[in-house]
Amino acid sequence: MRKHSDCMNFCAVDATKGICRLSKQMINLDDSACPEIKVMPKCKNCKNFVEANDEGIGKCVGLEKEDWVYSTLNAITCEGHVFNE
């Protein structure tokens, strides 16, 4: 399930809510995303994110040096991010 926080149109206001840039409405970040979602690059949707455990910690193998990362880490500026198929 994709959440509002997985969308490029979500603008965080605090730790639990934000504003949708499309509707201009206040929304909870953990609610289900709308059909207009523009998926935010995050480690969890990258083909280079592997071996994730139950807590969402995995390994990035897409950069020069492999390292442990959180699945929810924003990867908008990551040079190694490649969306999963």
From Swiss-Prot:
Give the main EC class: lyase
Listed binding positions for [4Fe-4S] cluster 2 are C43, C46, C60, C78
The record's annotation in Gene3D superfamilies points to:
2.20.70.100
**Which GO terms label this protein's molecular function in UniProt?**
4 iron, 4 sulfur cluster binding; 4-hydroxyphenylacetate decarboxylase activity; metal ion binding
Q: Which UniProt keywords apply?
A: 4Fe-4S, Iron, Iron-sulfur, Lyase, Metal-binding
Cofactor(s) needed, names only, are:
[4Fe-4S] cluster
Q: What is its EC number?
A: 4.1.1.83
Q: Which residues bind [4Fe-4S] cluster 1?
A: H4, C7, C20, C34
Q: Could you confirm whether the keyword Cytoplasm appears in this record?
A: no
Q: How is the cofactor bound?
A: Binds 2 [4Fe-4S] clusters per subunit.
As its record notes, the protein acts as a catalyst of: 4-hydroxyphenylacetate + H(+) = 4-methylphenol + CO2; 3,4-dihydroxyphenylacetate + H(+) = 4-methylcatechol + CO2
* Pfam families listed in its UniProt record: 4HPAD_g_N (PF18671), HPIP_like (PF18524)
* InterPro entries linked to this entry: 4HPAD_g_N, HPA_decarboxylase_ss_sf, HpdC_C
Family designation: Belongs to the HPA decarboxylase small subunit family.
Q: State the name under which the record lists this protein.
A: 4-hydroxyphenylacetate decarboxylase small subunit
The species is Clostridioides difficile (strain CD196) (Peptoclostridium difficile)
UniProt lineage: Bacteria, Bacillati, Bacillota, Clostridia, Peptostreptococcales
Coding gene? hpdC
